[in-house]
């Protein structure tokens, strides 16, 4: 039987009524992040995390169990209940008794179903034979009929991205969707008013998605912790489109071997497979390369133990499985069959391109059907120009024709239907998508047609809502672009603009690349903002129904750009009833909210106000405490203190005691400190837990402190005192040439990198540029950063890190004069303490280099500029990586467990390997100066292992934890492998080893 490449969701059987979803499925470890989404997430979607039981990463109810073939060699009664939900954590939403009850129901039903397979088949034949006898075909109750309601109509999938994702995550989601669009005829569109759509959310079950379209409302695709990787999102979208995992297909045993003894206890059920009658074969062979296939070591007892072993190919090689980088050829072929994509046509995503009828210019075949989808960046328009047109001409273009539609699919507005030999006029879309369909049904032979298109950015937009993105978003914008948009919404409304992502080349004055926004319809309208850098601009609201935007990029550094939504906006607070608010009404884009005067808080109706803690404080210093201090604070409190000092003063807040209910994102009880008096002022921090915050100093002469508690756990609270200090730097920069640093009672001037302070303590002059760095991490920059580096400058950095740890250099920004051989301005990095060490790289240009890693704990860096062109320079972070190869010599050397040994405990989830080597004939002696590692009877949590050779296959000298080895250890050969592993909980001081090479005779003499 020729089975499909993927287990497609074309489920069958009228008895089926369960809710299925599938997840990423590769061994991710998810803690419980229940309810970690933003509180303003108001979409009532179908949540894939709420399942009775899980089949690995697929949710099942009792009826769903009929879908799967059960291999009776698996004894599901041996499963460990505690292991359920390993990859997704979905069962953590139920208490343990519910887990166990559901599991045993699953086990019992699977066992009954597995043992009754033969009878089921016999009974089905008997039922068929009792029918009229006109049909000779054997009918199985769960026949292989397609569930068409699970296919997205027209291949169009509307989506919404939740508000709790960063700009880079949103860009990556869009890249993943464009990847599917590029290779198939599936189309993802931002949801407007569609009833059924997907919602990208952050859910506690990690990487999760339903399989296919659920219908009757939104459905979630969960991108949880550690899931925000391109390949994982492409995989999850595969489930949305309608695919199961490859390794569960019925004929998988012909292609892979399941090695059960290597499977983690309690996880054997993840390797069950589906019934042949439950999937629809589309003629595709087993696809080892599928992005929907599990890896070889999924749910393995050990990293290097296989659980799924692919069969050897004709060359005797085992194909790789479990890739998460891109769609395979089989993935693409199967998706195109599932959605019945025409064999002719494609999705065009470049800014310019061309296409033509099949066989052009030698004639097109009859009965041809082609579809081209042009998709460019939102905010761009498509200009389509036919350069040749030679089709059979008929009345109303009935037979052979080409149709162009202004949108993403066949129901979009028609721009024109063409045939004959007359060239159509140039066609321009109103948005960023265009749909072109070609059909032929005559036997007439003509050349066909050819067309070219171009994406143009900017233009006039007359819509009440939409999206604008920089050219080529979510990829880097193109150089030398200038785009101007004029947005017009309905009369008597304003234009609201909110940014989802923002990353434009940074410059103090936004001189290179920038986005300019003006309050009106022209470049002469009042300026709202001139934006660049990586911080998202605040929401923008025009004063009329028009907004003018201009994006400019120069010819050098290109970034990801921006994505923004616009909408028609009204001020609900301007209504006569003040929006129904008792005291204050705060207008927001697309909505509004009520707030209260200081000393009051919102009542449960969210409209009226009642007395609260907090208030307006105008003293130069004072104390703030939580309600009921020093007793536990009450539940459901909202306190706002507004502290105001005289002009040119700054306010500092110091917490003396701090104890609030805590979690990682401070979503229950917390205190927020802001510069300014409003709730949307600059946030200095959101604090909870028991760690006392650092001293906070306001940017201006006012500060807002807000405390909130929920209705559950209460703690002692906090006590803080504030004091005000005059900021001499706020006026004329304190007279400093470069930077002014305010201090309590005074101020100091500070110079940028490459300069020193003049004797007058205000001016800066060029300095010697030699740096010696002995810290494990930090930041280095070119002189005068972030302004252009000076000419004729040479700077050096000698970085020395903790012994046993390699120096790593990572660049965040880079712009040095370009030359093919970096002969002019350049940056050199050497693998050692001087420029005589081997070179790791000689760098110039505007492309950010890949990270550079030294082989040891020293790195030498030299920057040189000539007398001509100056650029922005570079900014880089130096850090350390543990492990590496170290040479043991007669003189003792040191090795430390972690780079911050002595200052901090070792980090969690560390995994480091050092190979100590010496000359042939010598041995290596290890003396433990310090050893303090989490203790456990079998050293199963944190430990250090020693192997008497170059790798872990050598004889193990011991596994140590607690206080370590009782005495020094000597190898029997010229190499020792040290392996240090920590788990994700308790950490200790670590270890300090002093090692050297010794002669065997010396050891005997010493002993």
From Swiss-Prot:
It is found in: Secreted. Zn(2+) binds at residues 235, 239, 245. Residues 115-139 are annotated as: Disordered. It is an enzyme of class 3 (hydrolase). Keywords: Calcium, Developmental protein, Differentiation, Disulfide bond, EGF-like domain, Glycoprotein, Hydrolase, Metal-binding, Metalloprotease, Protease, Repeat, Secreted, Signal, Zinc, Zymogen. Binds 1 zinc ion per subunit. Its cofactor is Zn(2+). PANTHER family: METALLOENDOPEPTIDASE, OVOCHYMASE-RELATED. This is Tolloid-like protein 1. The gene is tll1.
């Amino acid at each position: 039987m020729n089975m499909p490449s993927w287990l497609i969701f074309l489920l069958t059987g009228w008895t089926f009524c369960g809710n299925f979803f599938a997840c990423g499925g590769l061994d991710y470890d998810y803690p419980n992040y229940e309810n970690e989404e933003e509180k303003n997430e108001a979409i009532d979607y179908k949540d894939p995390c709420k399942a009775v039981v899980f089949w690995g990463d697929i949710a099942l109810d009792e009826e769903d169990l009929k879908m799967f073939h059960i291999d009776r060699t698996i004894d599901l009664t041996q499963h460990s209940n505690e292991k359920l939900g390993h990859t997704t954590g979905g069962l953590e939403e139920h208490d343990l008794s519910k887990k166990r009850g559901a599991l045993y129901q699953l086990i019992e039903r699977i066992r009954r179903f597995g043992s009754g397979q033969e009878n089921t088949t016999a009974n089905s034949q008997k039922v068929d034979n009792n029918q009229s006898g006109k049909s000779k075909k054997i009918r199985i109750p769960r026949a292989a009929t397609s569930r068409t309601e699970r296919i997205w109509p027209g291949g169009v999938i509307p989506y919404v991205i939740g508000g709790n994702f960063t700009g880079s995550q949103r860009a990556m989601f869009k890249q993943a969707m464009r990847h599917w669009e590029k290779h198939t005829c599936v189309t993802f569109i931002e949801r407007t008013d569609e009833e059924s759509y997907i919602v990208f959310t952050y859910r506690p079950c990690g990487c999760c998605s339903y399989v296919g379209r659920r219908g009757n409302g939104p459905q979630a695709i969960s991108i949880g912790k550690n899931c925000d990787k391109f390949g994982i999102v492409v995989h999850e979208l595969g489930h949305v489109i309608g695919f199961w995992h490859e390794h569960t297909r019925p004929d998988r045993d012909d292609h892979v071997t399941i090695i059960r003894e290597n499977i983690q206890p309690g996880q054997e059920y993840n390797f069950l497979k589906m019934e042949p009658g439950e999937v629809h074969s589309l003629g595709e062979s087993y696809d080892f390369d599928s992005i929907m296939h599990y890896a070889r070591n999924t749910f393995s007892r050990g990293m290097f133990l296989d659980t799924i072993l692919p069969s050897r190919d004709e060359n005797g090689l085992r194909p790789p499985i479990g890739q998460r980088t891109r769609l395979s050829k089989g993935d693409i072929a199967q998706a195109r069959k599932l959605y019945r994509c025409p064999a002719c046509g494609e999705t065009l995503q470049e800014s310019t391109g061309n296409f033509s009828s099949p066989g052009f210019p030698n004639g097109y075949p009859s009965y041809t059907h082609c579809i081209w989808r042009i998709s460019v960046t939102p905010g761009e328009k498509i200009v389509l120009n036919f350069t040749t047109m030679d089709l059979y001409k008929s009345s109303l273009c009935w037979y052979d024709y080409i149709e162009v539609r202004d949108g993403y699919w066949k129901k979009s507005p028609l721009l024109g239907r063409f045939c004959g030999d007359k060239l159509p006029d140039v066609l321009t879309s109103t948005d960023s998508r265009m749909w072109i369909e070609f059909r032929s049904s005559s036997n007439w032979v003509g050349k066909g047609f050819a067309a070219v298109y171009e994406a143009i950015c900017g233009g006039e937009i007359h819509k009440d809502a939409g999206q604008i993105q920089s050219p080529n978003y979510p990829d880097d914008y193109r150089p030398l672009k200038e785009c101007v948009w004029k947005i017009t919404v309905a009369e008597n409304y304003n234009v609201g603009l909110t940014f989802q992502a923002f990353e434009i080349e940074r410059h103090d004055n936004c001189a290179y690349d920038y986005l300019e926004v003006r309050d009106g319809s022209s470049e002469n309208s009042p300026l709202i903002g001139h934006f660049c850098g990586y911080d998202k601009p605040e929401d923008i609201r025009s004063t009329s129904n028009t907004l003018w935007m201009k994006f400019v990029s120069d010819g050098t550094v290109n970034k990801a750009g921006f994505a923004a939504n616009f909408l028609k906006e009204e001020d609900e607070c301007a209504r006569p009833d003040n929006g129904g608010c008792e005291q204050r009404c705060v207008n927001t884009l697309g909505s509004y909210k009520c707030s209260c005067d200081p000393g009051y808080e919102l009542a449960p109706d969210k409209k009226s106000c009642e007395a609260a803690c907090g208030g307006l404080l105008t003293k130069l210093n004072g104390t703030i405490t939580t309600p009921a201090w020093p007793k536990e604070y009450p539940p459901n409190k909202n306190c706002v203190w507004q502290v105001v000092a005289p002009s040119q003063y700054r306010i500092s807040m110091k917490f003396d005691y701090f104890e609030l209910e805590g979690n990682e994102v401070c979503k229950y009880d917390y205190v927020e400190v802001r510069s300014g008096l409003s709730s949307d002022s600059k946030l200095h921090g959101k604090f909870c837990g028991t760690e006392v915050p650092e001293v906070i100093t306001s940017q201006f002469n006012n500060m807002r402190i807000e405390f909130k508690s929920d209705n559950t756990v209460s703690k002692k609270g906090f006590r803080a005192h504030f004091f005000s200090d005059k900021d001499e730097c706020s006026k004329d920069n304190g007279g400093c040439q470069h930077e002014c640093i305010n201090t309590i009672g005074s101020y100091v001037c500070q110079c940028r990198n490459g300069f020193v302070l003049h004797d007058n303590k205000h001016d800066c002059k060029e300095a010697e540029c030699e740096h010696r760095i002995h810290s494990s991490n930090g930041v280095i920059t070119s002189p005068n950063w972030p302004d252009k580096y000076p000419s004729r400058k040479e700077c050096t950095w000698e970085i020395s890190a903790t012994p046993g740890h390699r120096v790593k250099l990572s660049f965040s920004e880079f712009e040095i004069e370009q030359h093919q051989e970096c002969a002019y301005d350049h940056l050199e990095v050497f693998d050692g303490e001087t420029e005589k060490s081997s070179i790791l790289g000689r760098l110039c240009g505007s492309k950010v280099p890949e990270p550079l890693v030294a082989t040891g704990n020293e790195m030498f860096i030299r920057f040189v500029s000539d007398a001509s062109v100056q650029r922005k320079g570079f900014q880089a972070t130096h850090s350390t990586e543990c492990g590496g190869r170290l040479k043991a010599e007669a003189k003792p050397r040191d090795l430390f467990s972690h780079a911050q040994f002595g200052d901090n405990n070792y980090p969690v989830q560390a995994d480091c390997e050092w190979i100590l080597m010496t000359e042939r004939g010598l041995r290596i002696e290890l003396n433990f100066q310090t050893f303090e590692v989490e203790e456990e009877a079998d050293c199963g949590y944190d430990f250090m292992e020693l192997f008497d050779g170059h790798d872990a296959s050598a004889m193990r000298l011991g596994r140590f934890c607690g206080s370590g080895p009782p005495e020094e250890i000597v190898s029997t050969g010229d190499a020792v492998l040290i392996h240090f592993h920590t788990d994700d909980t308790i950490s200790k001081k670590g270890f300090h080893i002093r090692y050297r090479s010794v002669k065997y005779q010396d050891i005997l003499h010493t002993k």
